[in-house]
Amino acid sequence: MKSVGLITEYNPFHNGHLYHAQQSKLQSDAEISIAIMSGNFVMRGEPAIYNKFLRTKMALSGVDLVVELPAIASLSSSDYFATFAIKVAHYLDIDTIAFGSEINDISRLENVASNINSLEQSSYFQDLIKQGNSYAKIVHDLIDDQQVLRSPNNILGVAYIKAISNIAPTIKRIAIQRQSTAHHDQEIKHDNFASGSAIRHALLNKENTWKDVVPADIKHLYETPHLLKKQTFNFIKYNILSRSSEELSHIYTMSEGFEHRLKSNIQNAQDFDTYMSLIKTKRFTYTHIQRVLMQILLNINKSDFDDEIRGVRILGMNQRGQQYLKYLKKQFPNRLYVTNINKESASLLKNEIKATHIYNLISGQRANDFNTPVIINKKN
């Protein structure tokens, strides 16, 4: 079965995602679409607005199979996020990766990716890093086509292309142009399409404008948001107060002694936004700092990093997805495709299970990896 992979967060799923899924299948001539989706925490360093099980139900209105991107990858920068996602795609025997982009020019994106790859492998690049220059500054100063690198989707697209070139060069790639909205738009300005940011803003402010920009058949799933970033603060504060700086230094992307800044400012903050204003620094982006805080919340340490894919968690599927899963199990009998958690898979998925428990602890949700079977959509 010819397959196309979509690397996603669906936070939440909307008409733009449905368009992307439809165009991905059409342009790749694929029989099946597979979403590699972040779980309960997302790349911007926040909990997802709805839990992964509800977002899987939403996603199955547009794709055939949904698998979980591990938490450590979901809370990583674009390069590692992309690298791990492409490894998952390769594990799933995906033929084509289709990603959203602000430009409909795959050759231009591939050219930028090739130039960055060459730069990263040069001794000059290593010298600049040793001199204390940031990766972002080096790329900004030495890569010509900066217009490509001004938008989040293009940056991720370039990261996917780089990862495919290094991990699975046989995977094809397609760029699907975004429709009518910018990634960070906070308002719904179009009759049919809106960014995830704008939809979250509408949901949080109890505005009904989101109802026009999500698929009609899943509107009923958009209930009160499950969890907001601000609700995590007291749990993060407890974790920082109860650990030493030495313990915090082992958190996955903690670096440059940032743990001391976290410790010295935590007593003076009573909410998430105030704390962020106290600890922000030119050394790190706002999003990077938020990811570090979520890694503290989930206790994801450097020792949790694993370069290998040892199994993939299946969250949901329709009939075509079930057929593809049968194909995978027959074609790759030694690979682990987890539909229900048992002793072996629980050890493998410990960070994802923990992330769900913590998400539920804060939000009051009940669905977890043990009491929620794989979601089957019988309509599509």
UniProtKB/Swiss-Prot annotation:
It is found in: Cytoplasm. Pfam families: HIGH_NTase1. InterPro entries: Rossmann-like_a/b/a_fold, tRNA(Met)_cyd_acetate_ligase. The keyword Oxidoreductase does not apply. Its EC number is 6.3.4.-. Keywords: ATP-binding, Cytoplasm, Ligase, Nucleotide-binding, RNA-binding, tRNA processing, tRNA-binding. It comes from the Bacteria. ATP binds at residues 7-20, 100, 153, 178. GO terms for biological process: tRNA modification. It is an enzyme of class 6 (ligase). Catalyzes the formation of N(4)-acetylcytidine (ac(4)C) at the wobble position of elongator tRNA(Met), using acetate and ATP as substrates. First activates an acetate ion to form acetyladenylate (Ac-AMP) and then transfers the acetyl group to tRNA to form ac(4)C34. HAMAP family: TmcAL. This is tRNA(Met) cytidine acetate ligase. The lineage of its organism: Bacteria, Bacillati, Bacillota, Bacilli, Bacillales. The gene is tmcAL.
